[in-house]
Regions:
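NAD(P)-dependent short-chain dehydrogenase/reductase
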Residues: 162-217
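N-terminal Rossmann NAD(P)H-binding glycine-rich loop of SDR-like oxidoreductase domains
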Residues: 1-26
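Active-site Tyr-X1-5-Lys
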Residues: 132-134, 147-173
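SDR active-site strand-loop-helix element
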Residues: 6, 42, 79-83, 121-127, ...
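Glycine-rich NAD(P)-binding loop of the Rossmann-fold in SDR/ketoreductase-type enzymes
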Residues: 63, 92, 96-107, 144, ...
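Conserved Rossmann-fold NAD(P)-dependent oxidoreductase catalytic core, especially the SDR/UDP-sugar
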Residues: 103-147
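Short mixed-charge
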Residues: 22-41
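NAD(P)H-binding glycine-rich loop region in Rossmannoid oxidoreductase-like domains
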Residues: 59-100
Length: 223
């Protein structure tokens, strides 16, 4: 099976790539395991060199259809769509957030539709699609009420993927990820970046500012 990871040079993309290579197989459309033959990592920058002949990298703009057409062919059995502009940056730069989080996602789905081979598309959405007061247990059908541009873009992309799946163009799956903590390196532009900083920075002997009150509740997932 040929597998594509968008955002393949990012924190989660690199970890996912490493895990897929270790595993060496994925479940195919018939429910049986298929050997991982090729792993394509697409991002705007080059990632780590895995030293594995199965890995290839495409450096380019995911919003460019020509780049996606290079990355996706009829042998691409699974796509992990991780590429995104994070929450704080999407709020600060509306056009960039729309271009990458929404327009590029639709272009990816359109390339899949044009290929006509119905690949599995796993889309990493976010709990930012929710908002306001939530029930104690959040269900799959809990109403979406995004309160940021990032959350709205993720919610719209979810609906697009569901409709492309309903029409039989792709086999779509959505994962609504919470805040991932602790991320290594310097803080990114995510609104929840402090959730890593309040742990990471003190461990490095550095000061960290927590911009939210102690009563704040967060969903967290360890990498």
């Amino acid at each position: 099976m040929k597998v594509l990871i968008t955002g393949g040079a990012g924190f989660l993309g690199q970890r996912l790539a490493r895990k897929l290579l270790e595993r060496g197989e994925l479940t195919g459309p018939d429910g049986r395991p298929e050997k991982l033959d090729e792993l394509v990592l697409l991002d705007v920058v080059a990632g780590s060199d895995f030293g594995d002949a199965r890995v290839s990298a495409i450096v380019g703009d995911i919003a460019d259809r020509a780049v996606l057409e290079r990355a996706i062919d009829t042998q691409t059995g699974a796509i992990f769509h991780l590429a995104a502009i994070v929450s704080g940056q999407a709020e600060a730069d509306f056009d960039l957030g729309m271009r990458i989080n929404l327009d590029a996602s639709r272009t990816l789905l359109e390339v899949c539709r044009a290929r006509g081979h119905r690949p599995r598309v796993v889309f990493t959405s976010s709990v930012a699609v929710y908002g306001g007061t939530l029930p104690d247990i959040v269900q799959d059908d809990t109403a979406l009420n995004p309160q940021s541009s990032y959350g709205a873009q993720k919610a719209i992309a979810e609906l697009l993927l569901c409709d492309y799946a309903r029409r039989g163009f792709v086999d779509g799956r959505v994962l609504r990820l919470p805040t991932i903590s602790v991320r290594p390196g310097r803080p990114n532009a995510a609104a929840s970046s402090f959730a890593s900083g309040i742990i990471r920075e003190p461990l490095n002997g550095e000061e960290s500012v927590c911009p939210v009150p102690g009563s704040t509740r967060l969903w967290l997932l360890s990498p």
